[in-house]
């Protein structure tokens, strides 16, 4: 029992060390004059919540933001408040999504079904605020990149699979410093074994689960795709972005890859960063 406790403690320490929570970017506004904000509960759990942020004028479209944190409890949508404000200031409506993570009722399949239900609940907000849902773009950071890609892949999931038959479909998707290949992430032990913790085990043990949620196994996505990462990312290796972009392009997807010199894993959360400017440039150029 003592050895088991030591191993669990070591794993938890590794997870915390691999995804230590960044501070909010200094000197960056998180609110926009004239914006409207409303919080929606899409389930009974405290983490089953999303915040709608609307610009003062008619929005250009809706961005679904999915935060990271290696799918571990203790991280939430406030990680993306600064980039959410930047989007609203640029005329986009934002659906900033929370979900249950490992240690907070999440894991397999709850983390995935939460993200699916949360994205679909956007339809409720759209009816209340007369929002068009023909231009909905998912943007995810780190572990949220995995989930954003998976949201785009949902229309192709088999009946009965977690997240199948989406109510709201993504028209484009961006993954920023994302864990885009879960099987490779499991093999490489990313986040101290975080991939196995959210899927329930390794690809060898749960091949059928990985087939349903691993973005690298769900290509092509069939929508415009941005893959962006910092060249100095030491949390999620750059190969996760380069290799996924190459595989998506080979599968026939419209892919843009941006590897930003001198930036690391958390720069994407700062709207002043080159990584975020790459996201905005791609987003604002979408048809």
Pin down the residues of each PLM region.
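C-terminal catalytic histidine-bearing segment of alpha/beta-hydrolase fold enzymes
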Residues: 242-287
């Amino acid at each position: 029992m003592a050895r088991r406790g030591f191993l669990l403690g070591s794993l938890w320490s590794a997870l915390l060390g691999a995804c230590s929570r960044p501070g909010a970017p200094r000197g960056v506004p998180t609110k926009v004059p004239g914006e409207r904000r409303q919080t929606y509960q899409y389930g009974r759990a405290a983490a089953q919540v999303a915040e709608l942020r609307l610009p003062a004028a008619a929005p250009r479209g809706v961005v679904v933001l999915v935060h990271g944190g290696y799918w571990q409890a203790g991280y939430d949508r406030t990680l993306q408040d600064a980039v959410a404000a930047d989007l609203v200031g640029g005329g986009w409506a934002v659906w900033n999504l929370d979900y249950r993570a490992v240690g907070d009722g999440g894991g397999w399949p709850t983390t995935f079904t939460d993200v699916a239900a949360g994205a679909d609940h956007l339809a409720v907000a759209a009816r209340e605020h007369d929002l068009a849902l023909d231009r909905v773009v998912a943007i995810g950071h780190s572990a949220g990149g995995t989930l954003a890609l998976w949201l785009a892949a949902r229309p192709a999931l088999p009946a009965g699979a977690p997240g199948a038959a989406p109510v709201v479909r993504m028209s484009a998707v961006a993954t920023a410093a994302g864990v885009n290949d879960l099987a490779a992430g499991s093999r490489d032990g990313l986040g101290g074994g975080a991939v196995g913790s959210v899927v329930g085990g390794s690809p060898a043990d749960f091949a059928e689960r990985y087939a349903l949620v691993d973005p690298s196994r769900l290509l092509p996505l069939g929508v415009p795709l941005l893959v962006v990462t910092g060249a100095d990312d030491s949390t999620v290796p750059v190969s996760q972005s380069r290799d996924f972009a190459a595989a998506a392009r080979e599968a026939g997807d419209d892919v843009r890859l941006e590897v930003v010199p001198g930036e690391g894993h958390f720069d994407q959360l700062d709207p002043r960063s080159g990584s975020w400017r790459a996201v905005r440039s791609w987003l604002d150029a979408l048809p």
